[in-house]
Design a protein with these regions (language model features):
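Conserved catalytic-core segment of NTP-binding enzymes
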Residues: 51-153
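A structural preference for short, hydrophobic beta-strand core positions in alpha/beta folds
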Residues: 21-23, 131
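Post-Walker A helix-loop "phosphate-sensing" segment adjacent to the P-loop in P-loop NTPases
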Residues: 14-20
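C-terminal-of-GTPase-core extension/linker across diverse P-loop GTPases
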Residues: 152-163
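Conserved G1/Walker A P-loop phosphate-binding module
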Residues: 7-14
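Conserved small/polar residues in nucleotide/adenosyl-binding loops
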Residues: 1-5
Length: 163
């Protein structure tokens, strides 16, 4: 069984990390929420995962896009991507990574949702893949380990690599 639902994938990741999961739409103004979250996170030291629904690259609120705000606040971002039926990814995936890099966003990497995880193909993508969430029976330890390593790399100010 594959996780085809981003919300379920985020819940799974939050459970693995022991994190609080918040879900928001991209129509909300990003800066007030990020200001509140960063102060709460600083005070509690608890890991918080924020799942955004909608187009994070579009300024829906009139106060800047979520991508721009996340970059400005230096908040680490993990992108989730579903493969097409043929196993390849739509052009929006590398375009989103390029946009994130142009904004100097703290990109932890990409997680594939569902489909067959093909490491050689993911390496040829040249994208910062961390792993795949295929279903509730999977062992996500490799993905979690990759994400923890990428977080440490970002904390040291180094660039994250690819699979």
């Amino acid at each position: 069984m594959c996780i085809r639902d981003r919300s379920a994938a985020c819940r799974s990741l939050a459970n693995e990390f022991g994190a609080v999961l918040l879900e928001e739409g991209c129509g909300l103004a990003p800066h007030p929420l990020l200001r509140e979250l960063t102060s709460e996170i600083s005070a509690s030291k608890a890991l918080t995962l924020l799942r955004l629904s909608g187009d994070a690259g579009v300024d829906e609120s009139g106060e800047g896009s979520w991508m721009e705000a996340l970059a400005a606040w230096r908040i680490p971002v993990l992108m989730l991507a579903q493969p097409r039926a043929d196993g390849r990814f739509a052009g929006i995936v590398p375009a989103s990574v390029a946009f994130a890099r142009a904004l100097n966003l703290s990109l932890l990497g990409l997680v594939q949702l569902g489909g067959e995880w093909d490491v050689p193909k993911r390496r040829t993508d040249g994208l910062p893949w961390c792993g795949c969430l295929q279903g509730p029976d999977d062992d996500p330890r490799g993905l979690i380990s990759c994400l923890q390593h990428r977080q440490e790399v970002l904390a040291r100010g180094e660039a994250s690599g690819s699979v």
